[in-house]
């Protein structure tokens, strides 16, 4: 069954700058989450770590692609996001936006 493309998924994959510790990076996460909660169209955010590839994966759901794009632009000049961004190797960063095309699959009850 095809799904309405009303929501938007944002996935950002990145590495940290050399010498940045996991603890140092995670110390900036709450400020970014608090900032995201205040953005129009924000639904949820989850930060994960891929130990095998030494990469971070930031997954954010938005109400629309417009909300996702506008928030991404505002984040780049946000004082709340700047400390986290300063720790990220921006050349390693890949940001992808997409819209759902099928119903989500859930575990059986």
Model-derived segments and their meaning:
Residues 1-8, 14-17, 44-54, 80-109:
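Glycine-rich beta-strand-turn "strand-cap" elements at beta-sheet edges
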Residues 15-27:
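Short, surface-exposed ligand-recognition loops at beta-strand->loop->(often short) alpha-helix junctions
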Residues 7-8, 24, 39-40:
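Short, flexible segments with low predicted structural confidence
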Residues 31, 37-43, 61-96:
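An amphipathic, aromatic/His-enriched active-site/gating alpha helix that lines ligand/cofactor pockets
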Residues 22-24, 57, 68-70, 105:
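Short acidic, gly/pro-rich beta-turn/loop elements at beta-sheet edges
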Residues 13-15, 59-61:
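Short hydrophobic/aromatic beta-strand micro-patches
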